[in-house]
Each structure stands twice: as C-alpha cells, then as structure tokens.
Amino acid sequence: MKSVLGFKKAKVTEKISMVTCYDYTLAKIINSTDIDCILVGDSGGMVLLGKKNTTYTTLDDMQFMTQAVANGATDKFIVADLPFMSYRQSLETTMQAVMALIQSGAHAIKLEGSSGNLDIIKHIVDSGVPVMGHIGMTPQFINSFGGFKVQGRTEEAAKHLLEEAKLLEQAGCFGIVLECIPANIAKDITQNLDIPTIGIGAGSNTDGQILVLQDMLGMNTDFQPKFVKKYIDGSKLFSDAINTYVKETKANTFPTKEHCYDYC
C-alpha cells in the first residue's frame, strides 16, 4: 500500500495493518515486511525520547523522526502526526507544520479530534495533503480527559463519536483512527463510514489495526495496556543478548579469531 487510494480500496478488500515507527533502523526492518502503513506518531516523544506524554512532543521532534523513518522505509506509506498545538494557533502556523512534515518524507498527516479542526482539515486537503483523523482517546487531550481513559462508554458519548467520525469524513479525511472505544461502538462507526477506520483498543471490527511497535515487540515493560498483544518478549531478548556480550567480554571469549583482522 503506497497511496491514499490503496487505503480506500482496502476498506472493501482487506484489513489494513499499521504500526508506529520513530527511527531509521526499525524503519528498515519494517520496510522488508508486509506492513501496509507506518505512523510516525507523536507517541515517539514518549517511547523514543522519554517524555511524560505527547503534549511535550515538538515539531522538531516530529521532523527528526519522520526523516529517519522515511529514509529507512522507502517503500511504505507514511503518515506523520501533527504535534500538540501545531494546528491550533493559526492557519499559517498549521500549514508550516504540514509542509515541514511532508518535506521530511511523510505522505500524509494525522491530527486529533474534530471540534475546531474541520476547516483546517479542508484547507490541508485542498492544498494537496491527505489527512487522517483520530477520535476516541486522543492523547493530546490527556489533561482534559484526566488520563488515558476509554471513551464512548455512554449512549451520549457514543453518539458524539459517530457524529465526529462523519464530520471528519465530510471534511475530507481519508481514514480515521479509533482509539480506546468499546468494540460495538467502533463497529457501528465503521459501518457508517465510506472511509477506513483503524483501531487501537477498539475491537476487531474496524477496517484495520495499529499498535505501537515497541509495545507489540515487548520492549516496553512499564506500560502494558489491555489492548496490546505482545508478539515477542523483546525486552528479555535484548537484555539476555547484552548480558551474554558482557560475560564473554569479561571472560575474554569475545572477540574470537573470526571477529579479528589478520596481519597481511
């Protein structure tokens, strides 16, 4: 999948697979896999840089990560997050941020929420840049939500999510991330849209799934949300490998002859 058209076709043909990525090395690995799309998420501020939450991720951070991923994943469709407040100050500031991410190698951008964003989305799309929406648990609104909490658990909240999704579609979004909402609500939203939905903690009836790469590879031991499936215990694998290297170094069993250069 290398374009927005691929997303639209996948709505009726196959499930869409996405992961986050923030660096060149992992991007190169992903580039050799069957993954459909990469999201350079503002979550990289937390996962890669150790920041408290995504409100601390800057445009400079996003440019750095997007460039790294684009250099490594040359065959993948790349979406990059507009960071906190970069699209809530002025239209000029918004478009400068959009341009920065596209020129860093992204093919599309993603922003959170619908309120106050619809005209912005239309302008970005009219300017030739595809936009992905994001509703439900939107991390940039963590201070309003009072933490990372499931959204849409009441009838009124569920109705609001569906309304948001329809408005984002009408504004021109080519797809929408549904994060941390009940599976039945995500299914209802998906069935009422012509554009694909990508779920994260939203059940199996969305048009696709996305996970933070480090979560699914078992690299984050201090953050294990319910919706994450750990496909390998990466933290243990890496720790064991590093400890083996330390033991061999101290025992002088590394390097061996095969790792040394001969004198000519």
From Swiss-Prot:
Cited InterPro entries: Pantoate_hydroxy_MeTrfase (IPR003700), Pyrv/PenolPyrv_kinase-like_dom (IPR015813), Pyrv_kinase-like_dom_sf (IPR040442)
Places the protein is found: Cytoplasm
Cofactor binding note from Swiss-Prot or TrEMBL: Binds 1 Mg(2+) ion per subunit.
SUPFAM superfamilies to which the protein is assigned, alphabetical: Phosphoenolpyruvate/pyruvate domain
PANTHER family from the UniProt entry: 3-METHYL-2-OXOBUTANOATE HYDROXYMETHYLTRANSFERASE
Family of the protein in this entry: Belongs to the PanB family.
Descriptive protein name: 3-methyl-2-oxobutanoate hydroxymethyltransferase
Organism: Francisella tularensis subsp. tularensis (strain SCHU S4 / Schu 4)
Primary gene name: panB
